[in-house]
Amino acid sequence: MYREDYRRFSEKAPELLPEYYFWQTYRTDPKAPFIFGKVRDSRTTYIEKSVAGIDMNHGVYIDVFPLDFYPEKRFSQWKLELQKKIYKHQIATVYQVKRCFLGRGLNTLNRFLGYQHRTAKTLAKYEKAIADYSGKRSDIVCNHGNWQGKLEYSPQWHYGEGHWATFEGLKVRVPENYDAYLTQKYGDWRSDLPEEEKQGHHFYTICDLHRSYADYRKQ
């Protein structure tokens, strides 16, 4: 959702959501290392390997990505991309993932500087960089929270005013020009993937739909 709506939802989430749904951001859960929000079901457990060691809400979730406009000027774009790289490396100190040689070196340096203890402060700076920069904005809309880089940058007309569609029995709003949006991001998205490419990128240590993550944390 656009940043303005995202901020409005963040303010209203506690009164809009049932008590067992937790709106997780770096503000509501300071150790959560995400530049976007998650609606977590606190009655359940989904502990991903990369963040298993973090003391935060680990309920089953859906991601909520804020959409921001890209700067118009090339220099501002370059500056923003540099800031993003720096902040991502600083936040990465809390993740349990395999890294290349350079990544291990940067991680060691950032941990020496104590960034593993400053997740919320780093994310606040990161959010300000992508959402509150000065200067003119272009008509390019960015999802900075997802992992596919500039494939997440789309012309505003892709989103348009939105389009109502049915997803697993639910009426949801999708991009107005969803075909153009999906084609830019995935190519021939209507064709089935080869079997060897049908692999997820989320790996968990515990998944339990009937027991709260808080119970596992006590063990």
Please describe what each predicted stretch is.
Residues 3-72, 92-101, 107-187, 192-219:
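Conserved catalytic core of two-metal-ion nucleotidyltransferases
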Residues 73-79:
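A short secondary-structure junction signal
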